C-alpha cells in the first residue's frame, strides 16, 4: 500500500509540473505571435530610415562612414530566462577572443560572462516585447559611454535570428557604410545643419535597429523555449504513463491479496 501511495504522490507532483510546463509553453507561443506583429512594424521603420539616410548622403557624402573604425565593441544579446536549450551557450562560443569590449544582455547569459576579462557592462534583458524599450534606455547610454571612454566607434551585435542556424554577427555601428547607388535628385530642405541632422538620424537608427534586433532575438528565444518545453512535456508524459502502469500493477496485486484473505477467512468459517 505504501509503495502505491508513494507512486500516486509522485504522479500528482508530475501532473502539477506538467501543467506549469504547458502554461509556460502557451505563454511562449502567445509571445511569438505578438512579436511577429512587432517585427513587421519595426522592420518597416528601419527600412525607411535607411532609405532616408541613403538619399541624404547623396548630397552630403562627406558625413558618411566609409572608413572602418579601428576599435569595435561587441553587444551580445542572450536570454533573461531559462528553458531555451543551448541559446546562451552558442553565443558564448561565438565570442572571438579578440579582446573587444563586451556588453552582455540577459540574466542567464550575464551570469556566465561575469568573470570574462573583456566585459564592459552587463544588463538585465527583456522577457517580453514590452520590456525592450526599458532595456534600451539603459543600454544605449552605455554604448555611448563606451564610444567616448574607449573610442569604440564600431559596434557588432551577436544574437539569434529565427530560421538562421548559429549566431548572427551584425555590424551596427557605424551605420550607412555602403555608398549610395541612387542618382541625385533635389537636395533636401533642412531646418537643421546637415551634421546635426545626420547625428540625429544615426541616433534614431540605432534605437530602431536595436528594437528590431531585440524583437528578433526574443522571437528566436521563445521558439527555442517552445521546442525545449515540448520535449520536456513529452518525456514527462512518458514517465507518467510508466508510473501509472506500475501503480495499476500494485493495485491489482493488492486486490489479489485482499481476495486471498477473504477466501481464507471463508474457508476458516466453513471448517468450524
Feature names for model-found ranges:
Residues 1-272:
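N-terminal assembly/interaction segments in proteins that build large macromolecular machines
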